């Protein structure tokens, strides 16, 4: 698909004009430039990557809806007008659309910048010679935040950098596009989705059964039950057996002598 082509080009493009000051690294580690995008296309690298490429997953989106703010934009005050929206859904970002409705008698005076939760900025419009009025139901789009986490506060800043013309930000909104991001809120090596839907553990507690073994360790290494602190019912916790005694937490009588481990200990 065209999205796969985008991904391949982002991953294989090379930095050009390395001395240019517009190059920066975004929140996902991609080199990006407001002049050059992701750089020059490396056709050979792109073809090689495409040969074993796995298609990207379904595109999802998060929308702020249009936010009515009716904020005056001061004339050449040196300070921008800022509006923000907090995104709670986790996407692995591809692109962001920004919608504005601005009344202004000389729109070229306006510098418009979007700042992501990562701190990465997209300059949507710089001061330029454009004597037209208004940004009426206008859409800007940026891929500068490619790969970043969508969660957190997004801020739109609008600054009038010219004299004698004033305006108002009437409405604004965001639509963020990307793929589902695997989240591991408690850092136990299991995604929140798998904890909730597969293992039924607490995605915000790394050790759901309080046996001193993380949920991820129990699922991926010891094969013990992350919701039962004594998987073999021998009166010893799984963590105590693994970390202290070295007994088998899945076998009540590790040494096969007719006495369970708990009785022997």
Residue ranges of predicted features:
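C-terminal subdomain of the subtilisin-like protease fold in secreted/lumenal serine endopeptidases
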Residues: 1-78
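Extracellular/periplasmic catalytic domains that process cell-envelope and extracellular macromolecules
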Residues: 1, 147-150, 243
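Residues that flank catalytic or metal-binding motifs in active/ligand-binding sites
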Residues: 5, 36, 108, 152, ...
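Loop and turn regions of beta-sandwich accessory domains that flank beta-strands and are enriched
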Residues: 51-183
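Sec/Tat-exported extracytoplasmic proteins
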Residues: 9-17, 50-51, 162, 198, ...
């Amino acid at each position: 698909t065209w999205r796969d082509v985008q991904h391949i080009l982002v991953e294989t493009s090379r930095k050009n004009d390395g001395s240019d000051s517009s190059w920066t690294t975004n929140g996902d580690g991609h080199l990006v430039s407001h002049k050059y995008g992701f750089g020059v296309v490396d056709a050979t690298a792109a073809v090689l990557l495409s040969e074993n490429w796995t298609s990207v997953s379904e595109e999802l989106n998060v929308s702020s809806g249009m936010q009515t703010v009716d904020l005056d934009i001061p004339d050449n005050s040196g300070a921008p007008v800022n509006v923000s929206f907090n995104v709670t859904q986790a996407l692995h970002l591809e692109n962001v659309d920004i919608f504005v409705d601005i009344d202004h008698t000389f729109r070229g005076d306006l510098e418009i910048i979007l700042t992501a939760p990562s701190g990465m900025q997209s300059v949507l419009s710089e001061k330029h010679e454009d004597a037209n009025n208004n940004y009426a139901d206008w859409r800007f789009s940026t891929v500068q935040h490619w790969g970043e986490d969508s969660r957190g506060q997004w801020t739109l800043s609008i600054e009038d950098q010219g004299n004698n013309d004033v305006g108002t930000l009437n409405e604004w909104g965001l639509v963020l596009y990307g793929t589902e991001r695997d989240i591991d809120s408690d850092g136990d090596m299991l995604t929140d989705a798998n904890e909730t839907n597969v293992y039924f553990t607490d995605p915000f507690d790394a050790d759901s059964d309080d046996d001193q073994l993380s949920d991820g360790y129990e699922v991926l290494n010891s094969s013990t039950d992350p919701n039962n602190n004594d998987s073999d019912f021998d009166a010893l916790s799984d963590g105590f057996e693994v970390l202290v005694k070295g007994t088998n937490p899945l076998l009540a009588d590790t040494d096969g002598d007719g006495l369970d481990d708990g009785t022997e200990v």
